[in-house]
Amino acid sequence: MGIKERNAPSQYKQSSRKNKRAWRKNIDLEDIESGLEQTRDEEIKGGNVEHKPNDALFVIDTLGDDRIAKRSRKKIKPLKVDQILENKSSIEKVHSHLTNNSTESNKKGKIFSRKELNRLQALVYKNKDGLTATSAASELKNTKQPKESYDVWETNPTVTIPVKRPSTLSKLPESLTENNAKVPNVVIADPGMSYNPDAAAWMKLLDTKGSEELKKEQKRISELEEKERIQKKAFEDKGLVSDQDVNHSIDSDDQSEHEQAETPIPSSKNKRKTRSQRNKIRQRREEELRLLEQKKNEELLRTIDKAPAISKKLQQKDKAEKFSNKAVSSSTTEIKLKKKKFGKHRLPNNPLEIKLGDELTSSLRELKPEGNLFADRYLSLQQRAMVPPSLPVLKKSKYRAKIKEKYSHKDFHLQKNSI
């Protein structure tokens, strides 16, 4: 076999640098990358310094350097001789009092006696009337009022505290009624509450009070049903059965012994609506809104046509209200409260004071009174925000009740045998 020829190793081919693609590929980006890295570091450290305001970069120093203050406060070290001669005793020395008889001080002329000083001041500050400053001052001193004296040994000193008028007395109480209507002190009762009422007034009052009581009863029943439903749901979630369900199931088993047919149980989960169903619901809603708007516009056009007649009726009504009896109007109107709560508790409702058909009497001798005048006055005070509503407080014992075993427990066996 012949020897194979070995070619030279292939050299690195440099890519052509004539087109723009090669320029982008082989360009040097070290400066740009270093700049981006620098901006990244500045953002990590708190942001670019050039774009920050002066308040974020500089602070006005109002305290100063503590080291300079300490250096200025530092005392000059005294000499050793002065330190030895310094008085280090904690007891003060006895000062010598200067007297008026001291000849040296008088000779030097530095210290005057009190009498000499008063004489010189009188010569200098002499008034036209002849009064001196010292005499005027002494007169003022004598005219001062003497201090009040009191007995130190008094056992029960009488201290008089001045009574302060509260600021709330000058303010009106908060109005609890709608439109800040004034609540009368004594509300006149409805004509239907009379012992011998008019038939129409009595029937009207009976209808209003009966509808109110019916609403209260319906509300109470609905709350009770909702409570039972929640309780039943809680039992079902836990996998238990309530007592009512057990009794109901026993009764239903007794009744359905002869019935074999089973009704399918509908699924409680709501099915997802399709797009067409949602579109139909939306279109129906839009159509209802359009019809409602059209109806409102038609009614508005009708009222515009009847505007003169309506204005005439309103004027007649205003005239009738002006000439009507104020007492009757105030008695028939019922007080409407805008706030049902004043303080911690709710305002109590007006008591139901009405006679039924079998309770109506034609004479005062057979009349059974309804309500209480004291309770009515107190309720009026609460409605006028003069007295806050409260609940009756039960009387509590001062001491806690203790459970104690009686001595008769030892005769338990005897009682058991006797039984």
From Swiss-Prot:
- On the tree of life, the source organism's domain of life is Eukaryota
Keywords in alphabetical order, please: Nucleus, Phosphoprotein, Ribosome biogenesis
Give the start-end ranges of region Disordered. Answer: 1-21, 233-283
Q: Where is the composition biased (Basic and acidic residues)?
A: 233-261
- Residues that bear Phosphoserine: S242, S249, S252, S256
Primary subcellular site in the record, as a coarse category: nucleus
List, in alphabetical order, the GO biological process terms annotated in this UniProt record.
ribosomal large subunit assembly; rRNA processing
Against InterPro entries, the record matches this protein to: Nop53/GLTSCR2 (IPR011687)
Q: Know the name of this protein? A: Ribosome biogenesis protein NOP53
**Species:** Schizosaccharomyces pombe (strain 972 / ATCC 24843)
* Higher taxonomy: Eukaryota, Fungi, Dikarya, Ascomycota, Taphrinomycotina
